[in-house]
């Protein structure tokens, strides 16, 4: 369900954008075949205000935005905390970060690789032989990072909303995926899915003898002082300040209604998408990651390298976690995330002149297309 939304986002962006620390040029990025790019201009405050004005509306109930980088900074918010009290949206509110979680997972795995605890060339079967049948070829750990493992999606609840308070163990999700057998040989094709990162989270736990959540906390959140960021486990609530999330849902007669989906058990998302964070924390993370402060140079290069795939298949657009795109004539690394009621993005230009973090309380966060408010934010920030 998530892949079409992310694919639509990529298409939309390709065709189209106080006092934060600056981000240096990325330590490594794939060759783009273009001349040296001009740095981003100062953030266009007027365009950014226009992008988020008029909330709540049919597309979103709130938006929180942070623009940074060497070219300057801008911060803004719009909308309401909830549709009952209609008080102003909390600009420091926490939200469900969805698949942005994957970049934290990748950072943890790559730190372990730098320490020699995890070998990216070693098959996953070496570490967790009990999971895989003989029908699976050796799956390099690297292929979990860059979405080329060949694993099929795992199964979830048929009626997700009806089961929003129920717990689905990630191991059950993985078992359902592996029962389907491989889709293709590892490394042959790239398919954006959660399953690789769910397995990667379990692998992190296997090699460390620790929980994935604790590893992320001690390696990423605590060193960067990301005090708003945590993993909720089976708790359906968002702790601390947050704005409510709403989702359009279809009635039996075909009409739609807005439903408050703030409370939702994310246990099945695990290392692929269960994180809760804030725009301030994700901006800190974005600066540190792409500024080379979280990973050694070799491991950051690994994250920012597009894999070579089999002849005749579409070229890769994801590295070891983030997606590589050209937006507004500039090379950008980014990652989106979406859970019902919440959509977000982190992005950085390769030259470090612009970073963007947003959270949009989108009423179509799991839809097939890009939310109009999010699209306007990207257009204003990265053009």
Regions found by a protein language model. Give the residues of each.
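Extracytoplasmic
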Residues: 60-62, 92, 136, 185, ...
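Secretory targeting and sorting signals
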Residues: 1-31
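Catalytic loop of the DD-peptidase/beta-lactamase superfamily, centered on the K-T-G motif
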Residues: 2-3, 26-77, 257-383
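Hydrophobic (often cysteine-bearing) scaffold residues that line and stabilize catalytic clefts
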Residues: 44, 48, 97, 101, ...
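N-terminal carbohydrate-binding/catalytic regions of secreted carbohydrate-active enzymes
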Residues: 65-83, 87-88, 96, 103
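Residue-level preference for non-acidic, small/hydrophobic
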Residues: 52, 71, 102-105, 109, ...
